[in-house]
Design a protein with these regions (language model features):
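Short linear motifs in intrinsically disordered
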Residues: 4, 29-35, 89
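Extreme N-terminus of proteins, especially the signal/transit-peptide cleavage junction
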Residues: 1-10, 75
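Glycine-rich phosphate- or other oxyanion-binding loops that anchor nucleotides, phosphorylated ligands
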Residues: 36-182
């Protein structure tokens, strides 16, 4: 992580499905579990500028957790919102970090964001499914939370403050069932 960003007072909210996906963020930002909040597991730094919520898997959980985090953390319109998680892919390589540049699901197709930063990692389209998919030929990235996260945060913040990043976890050469072994 960029030390300038780490040490700044930029307000950031992370929505992550699973604890294993969140570990590096919790360590980097020195976030601790806050037992005050019981609907979801919530972590924050001492200054209350960095918050992370574990949403659980699925669009409904992601939408509920994002809304809950917005309310309890008193996020402003200029708060940065980041969704980090795993995704299946037939195009990338296992472990690649990808920036999402378009999101779709069975109900909608949203272009995201207004402008893309210049970064060195892959930019890919994301399809959010309600069930795990193993046909990787139809979509660049497949997850189960991204579109709901974007739908909610797009109402809470400007598009330029929303970021979705996915790590490729499964694909034609890495079976989704292998994820359960960890």
């Amino acid at each position: 992580m960029n030390q300038k960003i780490l040490n700044s007072n930029i307000s950031i909210r992370w929505v992550v499905a699973l604890k294993v996906e969140a570990e590096i963020i919790l360590d980097e930002y020195n976030m601790n579990f806050d037992p005050e909040f019981t609907l979801f597991q919530v972590f924050r730094n001492f200054e209350k500028t960095r918050w992370l919520i574990l949403s659980g898997v699925g669009r409904h959980n992601s939408a509920a957790a994002t809304t809950y985090l917005y309310m309890i953390s008193k996020a402003s319109r200029s708060t940065c919102w980041i969704n980090l998680g795993i995704a299946g892919s037939g195009k990338g390589h296992y472990g690649d970090l990808c920036l999402v540049n378009k999101i779709s699901n069975n109900d909608s197709s949203n272009t995201y964001p207004a402008t893309m930063p210049k970064v060195t990692f892959h930019k890919m389209n994301l399809f959010t499914s309600d069930v795990p998919l193993t046909d990787y030929t139809l979509h660049e990235l497949i997850d189960m939370e991204g579109s709901a996260f974007y739908d909610i945060t797009n109402k809470l913040s400007g598009r330029e403050f929303i970021c979705l990043m996915k790590v490729i976890s499964d694909g034609p050469n890495n079976d989704i069932e292998d994820l359960n072994k960890f």
